[in-house]
Amino acid sequence: LPEYAGEADCSLYVRDLRSGKIFTGKSVHLKKGCWQELSFRIPSWEGALIGEMGVCFDLLMGTEATQTFAGLLDDLWADGTPDYRIDFCQETTEVWTGLHKEVSQFTRLKGHLYLDQGALHLSCADFGEAYTGRYDWKDYTAVFEMTPLTGENNMVNVRVQGAIRSYAVALLADSKIALLKNENGYRVLTDTAFDWKAGRDYEVSVCAQGARLHAEIKEVPVGCRQTQQLQADTAVLEYEDTDHPYLQGAVGVSVRNGSHAKYSSIRMRCNS
């Protein structure tokens, strides 16, 4: 706060685009002639979409209403680990041009990506992928609710570092699931038997902790998605990558070889 500025308190804030609700951090009284550092831990809340963040200055009593306020801002950034859920019934189709449409919160590499009846659909001729999140997420768990519809290469991705680097959990042919590594092309790290069926709902949980990956997949019986009281068999995959592991990255969804999958939600949380 410059010496010539009026008295003011200051706080950081974020705004949810969907509800319009504003969350603010602790208010700090500004000292004239001094740089001060503020921090704000954004709370976890379901279904929110942060579309704005910034600084709020509250002028104090005694400051003339007509006085021009001056405050200096050196840096403003957001970082940290994820703690939120994407429910696709709340996402929207963004129309960029008449022919160019994208799904909110996602970056599409390739494939037919669209929303239908509250779910995200991804299909392809050769391959399709879409990503969300930050490149610098480190240790986290991502839980995907997905339904394979056609084909034998329906996948979810973690530690995504772009189109040529990521890990994936895949529903494959011959009643198998596998953990894959994308090194400008996918290869199988480990696999196991799992009698998955097209048209059924599955919960895929992937924990990335350092160089170790732990994945679980189980069928979600009809009517049990909200209660999570599941009695279905669970398949487990574990692998520690000692060959140039990917230690950070976003999350995503992907299909290959003409496959088509739909996704109901993605839940991300840090492993602290």
What does each model-identified segment do?
Residues 9-12, 37-72, 76, 203-207, ...:
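Extracellular beta-strand ligand-recognition surfaces/modules
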Residues 92-126, 163-166, 170:
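Extracellular glycan-recognition surfaces and repeat-rich motifs
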Residues 1-47, 67, 155-188, 217-224:
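Extracellular ligand-binding interfaces
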Residues 121-186, 256:
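Secretory/extracellular carbohydrate-interaction modules
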Residues 30-39, 71, 85, 138-140, ...:
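Trp-centered recognition loops
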Residues 1-10, 36-43, 75-76, 88-90, ...:
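Extra-cytoplasmic beta-strand recognition segments
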Residues 24-30, 128-135, 190-196, 241, ...:
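Beta-strand-rich interaction surfaces with strong enrichment in secreted/lumenal proteins
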Residues 70-107, 272:
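Extracellular carbohydrate-recognition regions
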